[in-house]
């Protein structure tokens, strides 16, 4: 395995980690939108009182905090994965030359 292969492995691992982070965050909103209760609420939204459809600022703030924590957790995991591949590449580099 040459240095080009190790570099390609590191680049691919970064792209995979970034893709997983994006889809893991986006998947929660898609899952929430497809729940039967949410669909039923959307179908009967015409009959609902508008004041009940508003999300309180506390709920919105806690959702943002959870999303920020999730982003940080995924970023740390991605850095760990990339770090492991970088260490492997540096250890194998003298044998490849």
Swiss-Prot record:
Cellular component terms (Gene Ontology): extracellular region; host cell endoplasmic reticulum membrane; membrane
Major localization listed first in the record, in broad terms: secreted
Family listed: Belongs to the RxLR effector family.
UniProtKB keywords: Host endoplasmic reticulum, Host membrane, Membrane, Secreted, Signal, Transmembrane, Transmembrane helix
TM segment ranges: 69-89
Subunit structure: Interacts with host transcription factor NAC069.
Gene it is expressed from: BLR05
Topology term for the membrane: Single-pass type I membrane protein
Function: Secreted effector that inhibits stress-induced relocalization of the transcription factor NAC069 to the nucleus, thus affecting its broad role in abiotic and biotic stress responses.
Endpoints of the signal sequence: 1-21
Cellular location(s): Secreted; Host endoplasmic reticulum membrane
Name the record gives this protein: Secreted RxLR effector protein BLR05
Entry text on domains: The RxLR-dEER motif acts to carry the protein into the host cell cytoplasm through binding to cell surface phosphatidylinositol-3-phosphate.
Keyword tRNA processing: no
């Amino acid at each position: 395995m040459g240095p080009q292969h190790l570099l390609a492995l590191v680049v691919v691992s970064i792209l995979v980690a970034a893709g997983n982070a994006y889809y893991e965050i986006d998947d929660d909103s898609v899952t929430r939108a497809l729940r039967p209760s949410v669909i039923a609420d959307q179908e009967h939204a015409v009959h609902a009182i508008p004041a009940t459809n508003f999300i309180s600022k506390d709920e919105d703030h806690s959702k943002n905090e959870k999303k920020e924590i999730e982003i940080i957790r995924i970023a740390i995991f991605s850095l760990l994965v990339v770090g492991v591949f970088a260490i492997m590449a540096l250890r194998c580099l003298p044998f490849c030359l």
